A protein has these predicted regions:
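Conserved helicase C-terminal RecA-like lobe
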Residues: 7, 234-467
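Acidic, low-complexity intrinsically disordered tails
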Residues: 472-478
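Helicase P-loop NTPase motor core
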Residues: 116-118, 124-214, 240-241
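Conserved nucleotide-binding/hydrolysis micro-motifs of P-loop NTPases
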Residues: 93-97, 102-105, 125-130, 156, ...
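Short, conserved phosphate/pyrophosphate- and ester-handling motifs at nucleotide-, phospho-/glycolipid
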Residues: 32, 129, 149, 259, ...
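Short alpha-helix plus adjacent loop in nuclease-associated cores
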Residues: 94-99, 217-240
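Short glycine-/polar-rich loops that comprise or flank the Walker A/P-loop
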Residues: 83-86, 93-94, 114-119, 155-159, ...
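Conserved helicase NTPase motor core
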Residues: 7-109, 124-128
């Protein structure tokens, strides 16, 4: 609730849903993952003899990735090692990035305090070049255990901070640089692009599609495959082509009371009207019974004209109707809203609907071709969270700007320690080449800018020692 204050007004409903969920689990004789921990803990607490027997089964208990454990898991580990006291944990508190699912990096400190443990620091880095390791040592989160990594590999290129004007230039630069590395003989699967949130990859997806570059998304569906983007495109398509029956069907079904039968009846009326020279919206009301409330649709499609720029059409549709629709229909509405807001910015670079749809059609066509073709070596596009535990020869980190990375909510709420750890994880994925991208505009989503965020001083790049990287100004140079 603390992180999702919008649900405070629904506390009673959420509590009732939770009660019913618990009852249904009991009724079906089922448990979930949390139950497995809770019931094991209760079993051991209520039955010391069982706990003793289970603990005696093991001479040693070893836990890897200990920084990602939660309170219950830590307590169970303590119990399982209670007879012999031989507990080994391996972890890096600087890489604890899963607090959103209950992970607690403080478990590392609690273990050290409670067990009077011996510490063996594993500080030899076999992955990265000395130049990358030097930069890594400067970004160890402030609240983590002191550590100083040592590189054993041969010298390599110094990390690069590449500055572009906006996210469009960023996408162009990254795509071009990726192609150069591939031309130099690096396997595409040895190249990764990391970002804080999935929406940061949208422009790059479009750019790589235009260049016919293969990529694999670990962070979510492709931009043009998402339901909310398809909804937006359907609205644009019916404005561009009022006879597009498939797009009319998708657009109409967004509105209350319109199902397949009603939408088919409306579409038939629209088709006849357009062929007779009438506007589609003039026909909608007359072909729908009074019980169906389509006031918003009539208003939206009646006011919007084909001559309006696509960004304004999307903005009005989003503001007047679709934003609320997302909130009502999807648990991840916030992420979907970010995608739509990013799409408005992308559309702002196009003068006409047809130009925008033409470029997006390239992505849709390439998606179909990829499905029918044999798997090709692909560059990886992924969030930092999905990249944990992986490594690549070449790593790009997108949008390292205050408000993007670190995340704006973390800045506003003053909870930056996890953002520092996420950045640390991102940088430590690189073996040979590291590119950190930032934008001179200050944020990749200026349309929802916030002065506090811009002036907060929470800029990861500005905190880097100047001798640890090369700064490239790549604006308009490619």
């Amino acid at each position: 609730m603390r992180k999702n204050r919008k649900f405070l007004g629904s506390y009673d409903e959420i509590e009732e849903i939770w009660k019913r969920y618990v009852q249904e689990k009991t009724h079906q004789n089922c448990v979930d993952y949390d139950d497995l921990l809770l019931k094991a803990l209760k079993l051991f607490n209520d039955n010391p003899a069982i706990l003793k027997k289970e603990s005696e089964r093991f001479r040693w208990v070893l836990v890897d990735e200990f920084q990602d454990t939660n309170v219950l898991q830590f307590r169970l580990v303590e119990m399982l090692s209670s007879v012999h006291g031989n507990l080994i944990v391996v972890g890096d508190d600087a890489q604890s990035i899963y607090s959103f699912r209950g992970a607690r990096f403080e478990n590392v400190y609690d273990f050290l305090a409670a067990k009077d443990a011996k510490i063996f620091k594993i500080q030899t880095n076999y992955r990265s070049t000395p130049q990358i390791v030097e930069l890594i040592n400067t970004i160890v989160p402030e609240d983590s255990i002191e550590k100083q990594l040592r590189a054993v590999r041969m010298s390599g290129p110094i990390p690069v901070v590449a500055e572009t004007w906006d996210n469009l230039e960023e996408a162009s630069f990254v795509a071009q640089r990726i192609q150069e590395h591939i031309d130099d003989g690096i396997d595409p699967e040895s190249i990764a692009v990391l970002y804080r949130s999935h929406y940061h990859s949208l422009e790059l997806q479009m750019e790589m599609d235009k260049r016919k570059m293969n990529f694999t998304l670990y962070s979510g569906p492709r931009f043009t495959e998402t339901a909310h983007v398809k909804d937006i495109l359907s609205v644009l398509k019916v404005i561009e082509n009022p006879l597009d029956q498939i797009s009319w069907g998708r657009s109409l079904r967004l509105f209350p009371g319109v199902g397949n039968a009603t939408s088919l009846r409306i579409i038939q009326g629209i088709t006849a009207a357009v062929n007779d020279g009438h506007k589609p919206v003039d026909v909608v009301s007359s072909h729908v019974s009074n019980r169906v409330k389509l006031d918003k649709m009539v208003s939206l499609f009646g006011d919007i004209g084909e001559e309006e720029p696509p960004s304004e059409i999307i903005r009005r549709f989003y503001t007047d109707f679709y934003g609320d629709y997302l909130d009502e229909k999807f648990q991840d509405a916030r992420e979907r809203r970010m995608d739509v807001e990013r799409m408005i910015e992308i559309a702002g670079r196009y003068k006409s609907i047809s130009d925008l749809l033409e470029d997006l059609a390239v992505s849709e066509k390439i998606d179909i071709e990829r499905e029918s073709a044999e798997k090709q070596p692909s560059v990886v596009l992924t969030t930092v969270h999905q990249a944990k535990g992986l490594e690549w020869e070449v790593v790009f980190i997108l949008a390292v700007n205050p408000g993007d990375f670190p995340n704006s909510m973390a800045i506003i709420e003053g909870s930056l320690s996890e953002e520092e750890r996420i950045f640390y994880v991102a940088v430590t994925r690189a073996k040979d080449y590291l590119y950190i991208l930032r934008q001179k505009g200050g944020r990749s989503r200026p349309m929802i800018g916030n002065r506090y965020v811009f002036r907060s001083g929470h800029d990861f790049v500005e905190k880097l020692p100047k001798d640890c990287f090369e700064r490239w100004d790549v604006s308009w140079d490619f």
